């Protein structure tokens, strides 16, 4: 899955970009936080796990 597609899904769920980490971008929704690897392509299993974690 492309990183931008995963980010779009998180933003639809109310997450907003918070900051850049070392190799990850951090998105927040209230007290919830998710770290997204800064790569063009993200492993499908990882992307699905992130979406499943937030019920998306």
Regions found by a protein language model. Give the residues of each.
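Basic nucleic-acid-binding interfaces
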Residues: 1-20, 28-56
């Amino acid at each position: 899955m492309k990183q931008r597609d995963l980010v779009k899904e998180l933003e639809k769920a109310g997450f907003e970009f918070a900051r850049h980490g070392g190799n990850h971008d951090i998105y927040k929704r209230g007290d919830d936080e998710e770290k997204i690897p800064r790569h063009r392509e993200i492993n499908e299993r990882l992307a699905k796990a992130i979406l499943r974690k937030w019920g998306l």
